[in-house]
């Protein structure tokens, strides 16, 4: 896709580390990378970046624009200097062109063309591999140009079809790498299925590779059953069947079981995985086996944010997040965020949020507990990309009380009188008296005094001391009678 950013906004990313190449005997150089994208007026975007390593340096400059009806385009150039084997230096440029267009008919077209203008240009990966082994295929298949085309057509209720084309050629080999893939995705009721075909011709092989596949998924309540079969040009077949789904009220416990069989002596294979999303992180355990192996794997992943109100553990963090604060509501859960719950300090992290859009954060009322009331059970935030925004929920921590208030003469306190808990705390607990002196009020301590006022004169106010009997609690509400004096 072409590269774009909203006008006046800057997006940046920085990475540093040690590069691990796919070739097992390749070097592992350390590197640093910085990328910048800035939104210009008139629907244009400027972007660039730099990558620095001991034996490789490159920088990129580019510009993009959305032309509306015509489509979106971005163009960039990369200048790179590589130190290869035997201290041999190589310099070159790479030019890239990206185009995308969506039509009202439901057609999406994308074209991405890459051309390396000189044979001296190497990507960071290519330079690392060639430096490790000058006689390897990494040097032989040094890309000169590549062109990609993607076409998708929506068919409404009948699904969609797609066609992908890719061609690469090389500086040190006359052959070309050609890849074609096409397929259809459809649905009958809740059952989804797909049919696909792919063809690949590599310059290092005389024959092409062809693969046909069929996949179908059937819903089973909170689980899915899946079947997939593939066949290549030599008649070799691979079949897989499996079941996956979720458990628990928040659907934060996931599982999958899969069994497969391949022809030509490969035999059976299978795997089973269980994953749990908790408030402080994710845990995954899995087992897999095949003809010549058995493997057990496990992982623990999470995030941590240090902020003005403490330290909060979370699930793995996304680019844009929401830090919610719900004082006193430990273990309260967030709607549509499996496993996210408030910790003992009253904080929680919603690890993913949509930038530049209104995100609604809601608490599950059934997870708040009888001693917590929230003034507004949902908040709305509009974060910028890469930001951590805070959503605060005002809470009342205490008992929910249905109080019957009687004056000294035995008559009920007047309808519409204000009732306020007498306390030295900053948060005010108040409510309005209903008919027959009935008062519902939350956030109340086990014992205290309530100031009742229905006017400004001393004769139009009184104080009602009370003490709750916790054993009388019914449905989370404690009834109590109090004399207002």
Swiss-Prot record:
Entry's Gene Ontology cellular component terms: cell outer membrane
Record keywords, A-Z: Cell outer membrane, Fimbrium biogenesis, Membrane, Transmembrane, Transport
Organism domain of life: Bacteria
GO BP field: pilus assembly
Cystine pairings recorded for this chain: none
Membrane topology designation: Multi-pass membrane protein
InterPro entries: Fimb_usher, FimD_plug_dom, PapC-like_C, PapC-like_C_sf
GO molecular function: fimbrial usher porin activity
Gene3D superfamilies in alphabetical order: 2.60.40.2070, Outer membrane usher protein FimD, plug domain
Location relative to the cell: Cell outer membrane
Membrane-spanning ranges: none
Induction context: Induced during the exponential growth phase.
Role, per record: Part of the lpfABCC'DE fimbrial operon. LP fimbriae may participate in the interaction with eukaryotic cells by assisting in microcolony formation. Could be involved in the export and assembly of the fimbrial subunits across the outer membrane.
Family classification: Belongs to the fimbrial export usher family.
Protein name: Probable outer membrane usher protein LpfC'
Source species: Escherichia coli O157:H7
Lineage of the organism: Bacteria, Pseudomonadati, Pseudomonadota, Gammaproteobacteria, Enterobacterales
Annotated gene: lpfC'
